[in-house]
Amino acid sequence: MNLSRIVLSIIPARRLNKSLRILVMVNTMMVFIVAMFTPFYAIFVERLNNNIAIVGFSWAVFPIVAGILTFLFSRWQMKVKEQELLLAVSYFIRGAVFLSYAFMGSISQLIFTQVLWGVGAALGTPAFDATYGAHTSREGSIVEWGQWEGMAAIATGLAALVSGIIIQEVGYFWLFSTMALVSVFLGIYIWRLPRELL
């Protein structure tokens, strides 16, 4: 069965236009792969350095960098003609982040990786929101945004269930390698889409 059909069968009554369907499908996959790791981050970092303060510090680096860079990048992003390409670039960056996790060897590498993840989020999150918002309708925007948020929440929960089993059975390396491959695939998919679709 086609992945987009599965996603669309879960989405409630109101049908999304083609652009929104693509964005929901692609970004739901990204949310899913990110959520495969976040519940197990502390366990992963404790293997590198058995210090809970380092776990907290290293995780804090990602959202703080993402937040600061979102402020700095947003004015520049407004000038970018094809903002969906920023989304593709952010997926490529996240692919590099997950590959770095697969070969993680030190706390300094972890901090660098978290900074890089912040860069990817600062490029991708506003680009997704702007692109998605541009394709919503005034009268249906609550439903259209609600469908995206609902899918993201379900994907987050399912990812935690699946990844716990994957980590237990095959370890972090294969989880991160898969996450990296999917991220790069999503970036290529968005990059190669005809521009008029997004």
Task: Outline where the language-model segments fall.
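Helix-to-loop junctions at the C-terminal end of transmembrane segments
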Residues: 69-82, 167
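Intracellular juxtamembrane helix-capping segments at the cytosolic ends
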Residues: 123-136
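Helix-loop boundary and gating motifs at the non-cytosolic
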Residues: 9-63
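Helix-loop junctions at membrane interfaces in 12-TM secondary transporters
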Residues: 102-113
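Structural signature of the two symmetry-related core transmembrane helices
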Residues: 85-99, 180
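A membrane-interface helix-boundary motif in multi-pass transporters
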Residues: 165-183
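Residue-level signature of mid-helix packing/kink "hotspots" within the transmembrane helices
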Residues: 63-71, 156-157
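Loop-to-transmembrane helix entry/capping segments in MFS-fold secondary transporters
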Residues: 52-53, 138-148
